[in-house]
Amino acid sequence: MTSAGVFNAGSDERANSRDEEYPCSSEVSPSTESSCSNFINIKVGLLEQFLLYKFKMKQRILKEDMLKIVNPRYQNQFAEIHRRASEHIEVVFAVDLKEVNPTCHLYDLVSKLKLPNNGRIHVGKVLPKTGLLMTFLVVIFLKGNCANKEDTWKFLDMMQIYDGKKYYIYGEPRKLITQDFVRLTYLEYHQVPCSYPAHYQFLWGPRAYTETSKMKVLEYLAKVNDIAPGAFSSQYEEALQDEEESPSQRCSRNWHYCSGQDCLRAKFSSFSQPY
């Protein structure tokens, strides 16, 4: 799926013309299954682009409009196409497609976190930044609740998000992460205690503890990887324990734990340096 997510009227016409080439019929054969799979993939991608365009333009999302994109003749496949498109948008952008008015079948893409402007942060016709923030929270959790700057930038490199470059969705990543996410208190970014020379690390901020939890973040990671949350056994146990505490208790405990561990590591490192 392209990040731009731009839809135009011509796309619907071209896709509908391809329906004749890739029909899903009741006849079962290898060629029919392949054609049906191709058809569904095309429609999933088209519906994703349509939904992201509606989000970007802050326009209403109606079921009847989604059916038009898929083509009303293929209502039998609509449920699967709708599910796959919404799930893919969820794992990429961390927004959920929700029916906000069942009477008129009105839908909206809702950010998993309460970032300003429904995940956009800044005013304008832009796409949500929630996916990058959720990914950062995952990395911090997997790194023992505090992740050093070098590890986080290496992870972003793996996602082909590079420091110093400007991106259509995220703008300048360093500014978004170290300024916007920190200013909104979803992340904390500060010098590692007792470190010399100075090293810097990321922790969850108070707002992250209030609006989400380790279990929810782990469930998001599991969905991205299409596995059960329990597959991350040690993190799953930690997430279960955290469910019994308040957000402020979790925030305080993890901050003190990371500070103590980092100070010990820094002292050990200084003793091990050759003279």
Curated annotation (Swiss-Prot):
Pfam families: MAGE
MAGE domain boundaries: 40-239
UniProt GO cellular component terms: nucleus
Keyword Disulfide bond: no
Disordered: annotated span: 1-33
Keyword annotations from UniProtKB, A to Z: Tumor antigen
SMART domains from the UniProt entry: MAGE
Expression sites (tissue/organ): Expressed in testis. Not expressed in other normal tissues, but is expressed in tumors of different histological origins.
Protein's recorded name: Melanoma-associated antigen B5
Gene field: MAGEB5
